Swiss-Prot record:
SMART domains per UniProt: CBM_3 (SM01067)
Highest taxon, organism lineage: Bacteria
Gene3D superfamilies: Endoglucanase-like
PROSITE patterns referenced in this protein's UniProt entry, alphabetically: CBM3 (PS51172)
CBM3 domain boundaries: 1-145
Listed GO MF terms: cellulose binding
Protein name: Uncharacterized protein in celA 5'region
A biological-process GO annotation: carbohydrate metabolic process
Length: 145
């Protein structure tokens, strides 16, 4: 799983991670079996909203959900899951970019500097093990906090 920070400002009112899933295996992977989790602190009590700003797979094929989490530099995760219409990733292929944007309902600032999955130095796609990829409920990439 590759990650890049589309917004490197750690102290503004939006979190903008982008993702690219690479299939290093020898057979196609059905995207509907995969989920991506990005871990962060929501820095306050306001609820968090999420949007897919753009995705090569088509934003309508990606669902966004949020969950509570207790771990190092995280109290919340955002999970991206894929519909069957998203298709599959061929052996040796990749999903293409998915651009996620999150903000709080009151538009207050985040402090991403203390977020487990944030790395503002990653401005181009790079492998990043602090964003976790699940397949059929099992971790296949990354380390959860």
């Amino acid at each position: 799983l590759q990650y890049r920070a589309a917004d490197t400002n750690a102290a503004d009112n939006q979190i903008k991670p982008s993702f690219n899933i690479k299939n290093n295996g020898t057979s196609a992977v059905d995207l509907s079996t995969l989920k991506i989790r990005y871990y962060f602190t929501k820095d306050g009590s306001a609820a968090v909203n999420g949007w897919i700003d753009w995705a090569q797979l088509g934003g309508s094929n990606i669902q966004i959900s949020f969950g509570n989490h207790t771990g190092t530099n995280s109290d919340t995760y955002v999970e991206l899951s894929f519909s069957s219409e998203a298709g599959s990733i061929a052996a040796g292929g990749q999903s293409g970019e998915t651009q996620l944007r999150m903000s709080k309902t009151d538009w207050s600032n985040f402090n991403e500097a203390n977020d487990y999955s944030f790395d503002g130095t990653k401005t181009a796609f790079a492998d990043w093990d602090r964003v976790v990829l699940y397949q059929n409920g099992q971790i296949v990439w990354g380390t959860a906090p």
